[in-house]
């Protein structure tokens, strides 16, 4: 992307009716590591790919606990996600103290949409550079919502965001009809297979780089990390080998894809 006279502030429209600062924020989501969300009739599942800043650093948390019935996975700027997560936790606490009931998932997503819309309209502010997948369970059943830096939000049956997420969305679209009838183990496996599609051919899912969040009927939101992920990965079949492109010469190394930013 190249700078132009219409991207100096979020309040400036281009002649084509675009707000470039918002588009730049949405590009930040595409640079974050991939995450997948999907649901059945009884459960909602989040599966996220964790990334370490360096070999000396621990892997960043990609799935965050909001309330007993809600959790989120993030792609983009972690600092922005932490701020939004704290806001969501406060709203859930307010609902429990004031109304003595858990906050409905759709209501919480609406509040997030209102909060993220404010920086897109005021001078001197910038949009939040993070996308969220929100999984929850309430009286209406399981939910998976996607939020964007543009303040749009969508109710989804399955969704993936982050780097190389198009490959995961292709898998989800291909198996969409199976999700509603799946039990919990099968649903998690579908999420892991979709997430695996975002990885380069030489990499695979491990207990170190995968995090899983599950919520559902009679099951509070639970995050599985490290060794807790092993039972789910053990039941996953080996990754099929991708065929080499016929047009690529055997003696020429494959071009290295652009590495996404560390988010």
Curated annotation (Swiss-Prot):
Signal peptide: none annotated. CDD domains: proteasome_alpha_type_1. The modification Phosphoserine is found at residues 110, 177. InterPro entries: Ntn_hydrolases_N (IPR029055), Proteasome_alpha (IPR050115), Proteasome_alpha-type (IPR023332), Proteasome_alpha1 (IPR035144), Proteasome_asu_N (IPR000426), Proteasome_sua/b (IPR001353). It is found in: Cytoplasm; Nucleus. Its main location: cytoplasm. One of its GO terms (biological process) is negative regulation of inflammatory response to antigenic stimulus. Keywords: Acetylation, Cytoplasm, Glycoprotein, Immunity, Isopeptide bond, Nucleus, Phosphoprotein, Proteasome, Ubl conjugation. The keyword Ubl conjugation applies. GO terms for molecular function: lipopolysaccharide binding. Gene3D superfamilies: Glutamine Phosphoribosylpyrophosphate, subunit 1, domain 1. Ubiquitous. Residues 253-263 have a biased composition (Basic and acidic residues). Belongs to the peptidase T1A family. The 26S proteasome consists of a 20S proteasome core and two 19S regulatory subunits. The 20S proteasome core is a barrel-shaped complex made of 28 subunits that are arranged in four stacked rings. The two outer rings are each formed by seven alpha subunits, and the two inner rings are formed by seven beta subunits. The proteolytic activity is exerted by three beta-subunits PSMB5, PSMB6 and PSMB7. Interacts with NOTCH3. Interacts with ZFAND1. Component of the 20S core proteasome complex involved in the proteolytic degradation of most intracellular proteins. This complex plays numerous essential roles within the cell by associating with different regulatory particles. Associated with two 19S regulatory particles, forms the 26S proteasome and thus participates in the ATP-dependent degradation of ubiquitinated proteins. This is Proteasome subunit alpha type-1. The gene is Psma1.
């Amino acid at each position: 992307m190249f700078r132009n006279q219409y991207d100096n502030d979020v309040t400036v429209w281009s002649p084509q009716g675009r707000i470039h600062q918002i588009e730049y924020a949405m590009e930040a989501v595409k640079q974050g590591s991939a995450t997948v969300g999907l649901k059945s009739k009884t459960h909602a599942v989040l599966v996220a790919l964790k990334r370490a800043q360096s070999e000396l650093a621990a892997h960043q948390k990609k799935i965050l606990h909001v309330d007993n019935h809600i959790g989120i996975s993030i792609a983009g700027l972690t600092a922005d996600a932490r701020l939004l997560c704290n806001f969501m936790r406060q709203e859930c606490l307010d609902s429990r103290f004031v109304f003595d009931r858990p906050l409905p998932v759709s209501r919480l997503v609406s509040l997030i949409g209102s909060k993220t819309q404010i920086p897109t309209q005021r001078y001197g502010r910038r949009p939040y550079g993070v996308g969220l997948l929100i999984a929850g369970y309430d009286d209406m059943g399981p939910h998976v919502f996607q939020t964007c830096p543009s303040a749009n939000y969508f109710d989804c049956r399955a969704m993936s965001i982050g780097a190389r997420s198009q490959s995961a969305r292709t898998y989800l679209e291909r198996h969409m009809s199976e999700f509603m009838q799946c039990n919990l183990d099968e649903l998690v496996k579908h999420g892991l297979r979709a997430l695996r599609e975002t990885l380069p051919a030489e990499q695979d899912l491990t207990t170190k780089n995968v995090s899983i969040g599950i919520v559902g009927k009679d099951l509070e939101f639970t995050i599985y990390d490290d060794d807790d992920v092993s039972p789910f990965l053990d039941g996953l079949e080996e990754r099929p080998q991708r065929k080499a492109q016929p047009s690529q010469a055997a003696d020429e190394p494959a071009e290295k894809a652009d590495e996404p930013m560390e988010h």
